[in-house]
A protein has these predicted regions:
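A glycine-rich helix->loop->beta "capping" turn
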Residues: 159-188
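The beta1-alpha1 cofactor-binding region of Rossmann-like NAD(H)/NADP(H)-dependent oxidoreductases
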Residues: 148-160
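Canonical Rossmann dinucleotide-binding motif of NAD(H)/NADP(H)-dependent dehydrogenases/reductases
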Residues: 78-111
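Glycine-rich phosphate-binding loop and adjoining beta1-alpha1-beta2 segment
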Residues: 105-143
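Catalytic loop of short-chain dehydrogenase/reductase
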Residues: 196-303, 309, 314-332
Length: 436
């Protein structure tokens, strides 16, 4: 999942000199070099489950690592040719875009919502990631354009339709990878706010403050009916259906087109807050939408749509979910010991190379989902998680888990901790048109 639409800690502001409106492409929205302030040293500043700073050079290095991984794995042929990624700036969405572009030479259009840099304040990591990807893709001779804005709105959808029609003709892959705290419904104008809560009864379990390294119990009160409905409205499948209907009605889906959205199921220890909680109910609605979209695409040139259930990873979204960071820290230690650990780019490359393309046929579970969480859910791994879980304390956290690996991956999301980057050097926080 990717925080591709407005976030609670990144509340969008009115248009500034640096952002000429949400409906502008990133190239038009980039700051004027003449307005560039002084260079600055950028350090990570962690506030709870987020980092409020991002390093442009580090983000670019992280993107390049992912590109290098895909290129080293060799071409994915046949693969997608023209791809729309909705939620393209971080996490699984960005990894999907990189895999399509550098694995299959695909033309890509990315939709995202990020905050550009301001006076004395770096941009969000997704802003820097997108610029780095766009620069690398164009240097490789690949088509890469971007639209910055709220993907839930009709205006952004229409702008995407216009750009696809004029530049791409049709798309043969649509990746839907949004995770958001709120959605203004385009028909009713109602603002729905999602929440991460159990349903029915309070939930108590262990969690970890990943910054301080403190393990403690947390109790989360259950959601009420309105909160459940709001979370489904934000994180469910309605917007995915709206995107696909708009593309279909505009005749912008190529015959045989594929669409995929991402989900997570996980082990029983996380079910109360995830699978059986508000977010899980929203994911159930995403699966409902997948079935509807699949039926429509099958009647439109034998296309297909489905959910890919992915591995638990450190992302901007997962770090906000109670209990999950402790589970991920345990999981990382166990899977690294087995040599089966994967990050976002490894997951998406395996999805594309073994399930979607490369002459392969998807393998579905009983629910019609592709499972690239299969290595995570191996019985021996989950048995080991269950054995370790009760014994983890603040005192033995570093011994029992890979909290160091969790922290490293967390900081990399924001461009920190990358090899070869001088974090003691002053850096230009803005990225102007000359950078792409």
């Amino acid at each position: 999942m990717v925080w591709a639409v407005s976030r609670p800690f990144l509340t969008p502001k009115p248009a500034t000199d640096y952002c000429l409106g949400l409906a502008k492409s990133i190239l038009d929205a980039l700051p004027d070099p003449s307005e560039t302030p002084a260079r600055m040293i950028i350090r990570p500043k962690v506030r709870g489950f987020i980092c409020v700073t991002a390093h442009p050079t580090g983000c670019a290095a992280h993107v390049q690592e992912w590109i290098d991984y895909v290129k080293a794995k060799g071409p994915i042929k046949p693969g997608p040719k023209k791809v729309l990624v909705i939620g393209a700036s971080t996490g699984y969405g960005l990894a999907s875009r990189i895999t399509a572009a550098f694995g299959s030479g695909a033309a890509t259009l990315g939709i995202f919502f990020e905050r550009p840099s301001e006076e004395g304040r770096p941009a969000t990591p997704g802003w820097y990631n997108t610029i780095a990807f766009t620069h690398a893709a164009r240097a490789a001779g690949l088509y890469a354009k971007n639209i910055m804005g709220d993907a839930f709105t009709d205006e952004i959808k229409q702008q995407a339709l216009n750009l696809i029609r004029s530049d791409m003709g049709q798309v043969d892959l649509v990746v839907y990878s949004l995770a958001a705290p709120r959605r203004t419904h385009p028909r009713t104008g109602v603002v729905h706010k999602s929440c991460l809560k159990p349903v029915g009864v309070p939930y108590t379990n262990k969690t970890v403050d990943t910054d301080k390294g403190i393990v403690s119990d947390v109790t989360i009160e259950p959601a009420n009916e309105a909160e459940v409905a709001d979370t489904v409205a934000v994180m469910g499948g309605e917007d995915w259906e709206m995107w696909m209907n708009a593309l279909r009605d505009a005749n912008l889906l190529a015959p045989g087109a594929t669409s995929v959205a991402y989900s997570y199921i996980g082990p029983e220890v996380t079910w109360a807050i995830y699978k059986n909680g508000t977010i899980g109910l929203a994911k159930n609605d995403l699966e409902r939408a997948a079935r509807n979209i699949d039926a429509q695409l099958k009647s439109h040139g034998n296309g297909r749509a489905f959910i890919s259930v992915n591995k638990a990873l450190v992302t901007q979204a997962s770090s906000a979910i109670p209990v999950v960071p402790l589970y991920i820290s345990i999981l990382y230690k166990l899977m690294k010991a087995k040599g089966t650990h994967e990050g976002c780019i490894e997951q998406m490359h395996r999805l594309f190379a073994t399930q979607l393309y490369n002459g392969k046929t998807p393998t579905f579970d009983a629910g019609g989902r592709v499972r690239v969480d299969d290595w995570e859910m191996r019985p021996e791994i989950q048995a080991a998680v269950r054995e370790v879980w009760p014994s983890v304390t603040t005192e033995n956290l570093s011994e029992k888990t890979d909290i160091a690996g969790y922290r490293s991956d967390f900081l990399k999301l924001y461009g920190f901790g990358l090899a070869g980057v001088n974090y003691d050097a002053e850096v230009e926080p803005h990225r102007s048109k000359s950078h792409v």
